[in-house]
Structure formats: structure tokens, C-alpha cells
């Protein structure tokens, strides 16, 4: 599923450039992705759109609060992912409403705890879905696969 999300980011400048879901599914299948992964990715993207709509009110709230994670969130996300989300927020890359969307989409992931590389992809897709300006250094960090670097 995450390979498909990166593929979409690399091949479509904005979410509006993506074709309708049925056409996109056919294109992804033609690109060699498995149907189960395509269904998972499209479902995840649908959830992203729903969550974004729900967070519109949150965007109006002042961002002076402090985020406390529940035990369930901590178990699903893990300390490395929570630390990275906090880093993005403190660096001004991820405002509070987008942070909540990242957390929601990470909790929708079947992986537990969600690896740091997956959190980076989730954050990238949330920023992409909002057509946010992404600094080149931030983009490089979000697309960096630490797991691949650790292999000798």
C-alpha cells in the first residue's frame, strides 16, 4: 500500500491530477501493483479525504495546546514515530490540524507500531493532499528510507 502512495506522489503533482478511483485502479494495476494493495491504498486515501473534511473545524482552533497521546495511540505509533511527528510540528512543517490527520491515518495503518519510514510517507501524503509547500530538505527527509541505508 505504501509503495502505491509514494507512486501517486511521484506521478501526480496534486491530488486533483489523479483520475477517478476506477481509472486510477486500472492504471495502478497496469503499473504492476497487486489488486489487494490497490484496494488498501484507495481505501486509505478515501479515509484521508474524510478525515481532512472533519478537521476543517480544528484548523480554526488556536494551536497553543500540547498534544497528549493515549496509550492506544502510543502503542500503534511507537516512540520514534511520535518523536518524528513532534519534530515536524515544532519545525513548522506540520500544523496541529495536519498533525491530527497524520495520526488518524497512521492509526488506520495495519502495521503496529507504525515504522518511522511509514510515518514519513503518511506525513508526505497528508501534506500532498493539502497541496502544502514542502521545502526540499523536508521532502528529502520524508522520502529518505533509513531501513534501506542500514543494510550493509
From Swiss-Prot:
It comes from the Bacteria. InterPro entries: Smg (IPR007456). Belongs to the Smg family. This is Protein Smg homolog. It comes from Bordetella avium (strain 197N). The lineage of its organism: Bacteria, Pseudomonadati, Pseudomonadota, Betaproteobacteria, Burkholderiales.
